[in-house]
A protein has these predicted regions:
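Signature of Gram-negative outer-membrane beta-barrel scaffolds
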Residues: 1-25
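Transmembrane beta-strands of outer-membrane beta-barrel pores
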Residues: 1-3, 31-37, 46-47, 78, ...
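Outer-membrane beta-barrel signature, preferentially recognizing the C-terminal barrel domain
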Residues: 6, 23, 35-84, 88-90, ...
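Residues on the lipid-exposed face of transmembrane beta-strands in outer-membrane beta-barrel proteins
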Residues: 15-19, 70-76, 121-127, 165-173, ...
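Repeated loop/turn-to-beta-strand initiation elements of outer-membrane beta-barrel proteins
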Residues: 24-27, 78-82, 131-135, 174-182, ...
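Outer membrane beta-barrel strand-and-loop segments of large Gram-negative receptors
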Residues: 63, 82-143, 147-168
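Conserved C-terminal beta-signal and adjacent last beta-strands/turns
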Residues: 160-206
Length: 206
């Protein structure tokens, strides 16, 4: 028996507009869109046990999601960047847990949400310290929101304000042969949301 899971027709606009007030002040508007499809294993109706009380289950009804992004960017002195951004993702999917009603098991399955919405502001500041240290600092603040009205007899509308600090560094250890450089990068995020989850601090140094 065949059935149609989805049948839609959608525009995916992509555009970049730039206005140069003078070489010291540049304003740019970026609009982009895309479509993301689930993997084969995400839609395969197969049950994979994690332990005696948890399983991973495929979702044959999982739909691809569309993403629409917009950025308004101001570039000062062809060096410093200030931006405002917004990302809207209808039908966004993520792996979420729910309680099986027929047996004592947690089921982890990819589910389509109503939407994911993020918007915020950021600033990018590059700088140098002599010939030894070249760095770029990114600071941003945003509001994250994910919503699903029908989730196994439940619903959620999870939202959170978050901040992010990111720093990319290149240290020149030797300019003569051999030319040695060291890259040291790191970020810190105050938190995030994913479906019913309220995630704590995230960080990484590499």
């Amino acid at each position: 028996m065949k059935s149609t899971l989805w049948n839609d027709w959608t525009l995916f606009p992509n555009a970049t507009l730039s206005y140069t007030v003078n070489p010291m002040h540049i304003i740019q508007l970026d609009i982009s869109s895309d479509k993301t499809y689930p993997s084969y294993w995400d839609v395969t109706p197969q049950e994979s046990p994690i332990n005696s009380y948890s399983v991973i289950l495929g979702n044959p009804s999982l739909k691809p999601y569309r993403s629409y992004s917009g950025q308004l960017i101001y570039i000062l002195k062809q060096k410093y960047t200030i931006l405002a951004f917004c990302d809207y993702v209808p039908d966004y999917f993520a792996q979420l847990p729910y309680q099986n009603t027929s047996e004592l098991k947690n089921v982890f399955r990819y589910e389509n949400m109503d939407y994911q919405l993020q918007f915020g502001v950021g600033v990018i500041v590059p700088f140098r310290v002599g010939e030894f240290w070249n760095s770029q600092v990114t600071l941003s603040g945003q509001r994250m929101q994910e919503k699903l009205d029908h989730f196994h007899d439940l619903s959620f509308h999870n939202e959170k304000y978050t901040g992010q600090f990111k720093m990319d560094n290149t240290f020149t250890l030797s300019k003569s042969r051999p030319n040695l450089k060291l890259d040291l990068n790191g970020y810190f995020v105050t938190g995030a949301v994913q479906g019913i989850y309220d995630l704590g601090h995230l960080y990484d140094v590499s």
